[in-house]
Amino acid sequence: MSEDWEPAAFKTRTDTVLAGFLDEEATALLAVDETLDPLAEALRSTARHGKRLRAAFCYWGWRAAGQPDSDALMRAAAAMELVHAAAVVHDDLIDDSPLRHGRPTAHHAFAALPHPRTTAHDAFAAPPHPRRRPRAAARALALLLGDHLMALAGRLYAESGLPAAYLSRGRPLWAALARELIAGEALEILHTGGLPDTGTSLKVIRYKTAKYTVEQPLLLGALLAGAPTALREGLSRYGLPLGEAFQLRDDLLGLYGDPARTGKAPLDDLRTGRPTVLLAETWRAADPAQRELLRRTLAGHGPHDEPHGPGEDALREVRALMAELGAPARVERMIAGRVEEAVRTLDELDLPGTAHRALTDLAHRAAVRHH
């Protein structure tokens, strides 16, 4: 790989690692039973989508410590993308999101599969033989897919080809990553439908997304490279605010981005009542009548609370209220401040020039984007 940071080439390299690894796993699944083809295809599709930011941050954490390019490190870095793939499958399942990258999410894709025909035994059993509804079966398959992807992330890391002594440095971080990712997702579920609060929402995004998107991949690369404590602490000071900026941008795009570019269903965050910073900032600025509109539209309308949530017109009214009260502009300022903090931190660290340039570019790619 060139010493210069080439995002497209890096993505291709990461995709190649994932495609080979996941194709082998898909083939192994099919050797068990050909009926597992939908699960095998879902694994293969994981290698086709994504910006590969998490792999890039892991790679440049390694390079920031002065280590050279390494194919084995690329495999360890690619494991971060499988962590993300697992988190996405589970998050889409929890939110009942229909689209991701412009394609059906895993549980929606599984639900579209032909349902097995009822057998004569089923039809005439007394009492009738219990059969799982297609929706329940699809959700169960997606749950298993996400679990499998997380297990595969650990396997790809362990089989990366790096020396065992290097890999052992990263094991405590793997444990923290899993704990904090689950904690963040659980915090979001527990706070959905509660009183909006900006501090609470920022804590949710820090643990649900920010840490495993930027800080922890960076630290994993640095740990694998044997980086000193001072460098790791500096990378944390860069990674945490940048990870928050990444998710704040994602929340803005979810409501105000072009669905043709984001590949996600618009209004999903409002429909599920997620405790976003956008919602909290809107609530903070709203008068009593506007707060009543928010309560009436969003309360009790999580994905599994009622069969019919708020209508599109009501959700658009809330989105318009957010803009009217200046919430998107305040979130934009939060993003800009966090990116500035991250880039300023880089200038304080003693980094190789290539790593400094790459991490500066990645900061802008993560937070200033349209999808």
Stretches found by the model and what they are:
Residues 1-85, 89-131, 135, 186-197, ...:
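Conserved N-terminal diphosphate/IPP-binding helix and adjacent helical/loop segment
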Residues 57, 153, 279, 342, ...:
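Residue-level signal for inorganic ion chemistry
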Residues 68-83, 139, 168-173, 231-242, ...:
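Alpha-helical scaffolds flanking conserved acidic
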Residues 138-143, 199-209:
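A short glycine-threonine-serine/GTX helix/turn-capping micro-motif
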Residues 157-174, 294-296:
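Transmembrane helix-loop-helix
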Residues 316-371:
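Short hairpin/turn module used for nucleic-acid contact or packing/dimerization
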